[in-house]
């Protein structure tokens, strides 16, 4: 008879919106399947942590993550805090002997990311940044097409995610010391990660960019239905960013992201271009040409399964079976290097070399 493995023990640090809506539902699903046991939830807001604990089987609640880590043994720690706590919470989890899944962005700067990777290597534990868009069916389909060679030699990518009005009106997304930046660090990190992954994770060598703050700090700013109003004087991040990134081998990427811009409607799009064909997200398809026709194949039947669900289940499986994670921390470090270079480029008005 095969001995039944004990459920993995899971702890979650930070029980705000991202944990409540996109992480904990899937850990509870795994708990119902008998694969994990949610042991502890940590948050500085008592009502928030207790509300989520009530949905679990027997999770204890804590206001201090170090107390939670010292009183329990965890196989997995899921870090869902504000950006500025990602590094310290991740390193604490790794040092306590847990494998760590941490929400994007990886951290506030390259130095913090490097410290997280060093801690994971020292502890010999898994570390993965929650780049859920890689796990979506549409991304998996595009990766399949590119990997098949149908696009030929990939040479450039273009991505944009422009919200007409969509500054997050919850948490502290709009405060630089808490989050680092605005849409570049919030939604730009998703688009850049997906682009670079689809291109085969080339090494970035230089970036130029510009960030703007034109709407978020205005008293007359209309933010549509994006949470509760915030004091305009608190808004000190960008609400629009544009960038051009160069990679080894001559590959390039262009990007535009916004929380607020005077466009017709929200735009989310991406193209990865090769010399034989290209792929895009809206519409989701493969585009090519031969000597007498333009060809395109589109897909609208792909699974609607949430990328967050696939991401959580993937990380659980990696820990269960000692498998490599899809989002390698070194890849996330490269994305952070690009982000840091874009902000520096904007400040200095010149291209920044990425080492």
What are these regions (language model features)?
Residues 1-56:
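N-terminal Rossmann-like dinucleotide-binding module
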Residues 18, 133-234, 349:
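Predominantly a Rossmann-like dinucleotide-binding segment in NAD(P)-dependent oxidoreductases
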Residues 115-132, 152-157:
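Rossmann-fold dehydrogenase core element
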Residues 1-7, 12-13, 76-78, 114, ...:
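C-terminal helix-rich "cap/oligomerization" subdomain common to oxidoreductases
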Residues 193-285, 312-323:
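Contiguous beta-strand/loop segments that form the cofactor/metal-binding neighborhood of enzyme cores
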């Amino acid at each position: 008879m095969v001995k039944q493995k004990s459920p993995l023990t899971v702890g979650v640090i930070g029980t705000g919106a991202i944990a409540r809506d996109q992480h904990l539902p899937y850990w509870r699903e795994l708990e119902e399947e008998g694969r994990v046991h949610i042991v502890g939830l940590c948050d500085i807001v008592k009502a928030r942590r207790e509300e989520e604990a009530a949905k679990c089987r027997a999770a204890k609640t804590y206001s201090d993550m170090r107390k939670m880590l010292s009183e329990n043994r965890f196989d997995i720690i899921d870090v869902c805090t504000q950006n500025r706590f990602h590094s310290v919470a991740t390193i604490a989890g790794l040092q306590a002997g847990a494998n760590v899944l941490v929400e994007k962005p990886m951290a506030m700067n390259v130095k913090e990311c490097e410290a997280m990777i060093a801690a994971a290597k020292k502890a010999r534990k898994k570390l993965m940044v929650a780049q859920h868009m890689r796990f979506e069916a549409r991304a998996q389909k595009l990766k399949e097409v590119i990997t098949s060679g149908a696009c030929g030699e990939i040479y450039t990518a273009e991505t944009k995610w422009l919200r007409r009005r969509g500054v997050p009106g919850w948490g502290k997304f709009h405060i630089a010391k808490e989050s680092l930046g605005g849409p570049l660090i919030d939604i730009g990190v998703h688009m850049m990660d997906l682009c670079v992954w689809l291109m085969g994770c080339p090494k970035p060598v230089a970036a130029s960019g510009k960030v703007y703050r034109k709407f978020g700090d205005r008293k007359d700013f209309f933010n549509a239905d994006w949470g509760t109003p915030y004091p305009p004087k608190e808004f000190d991040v960008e609400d629009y960013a544009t960038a051009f990134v160069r990679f080894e081998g001559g590959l390039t990427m262009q990007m535009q992201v916004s929380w607020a811009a005077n466009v017709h409607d929200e735009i989310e799009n991406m193209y990865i271009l090769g010399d034989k064909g290209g792929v895009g997200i809206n519409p989701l398809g493969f585009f090519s040409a031969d000597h007498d026709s333009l060809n395109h194949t589109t897909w609208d039947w792909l699974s609607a399964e949430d990328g967050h669900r696939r991401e959580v289940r993937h990380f659980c499986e990696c820990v269960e079976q000692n498998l490599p994670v899809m989002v390698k921390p070194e890849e996330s470090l490269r994305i952070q290097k690009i982000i840091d270079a874009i902000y520096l480029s904007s400040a200095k008005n010149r291209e920044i070399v990425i080492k």
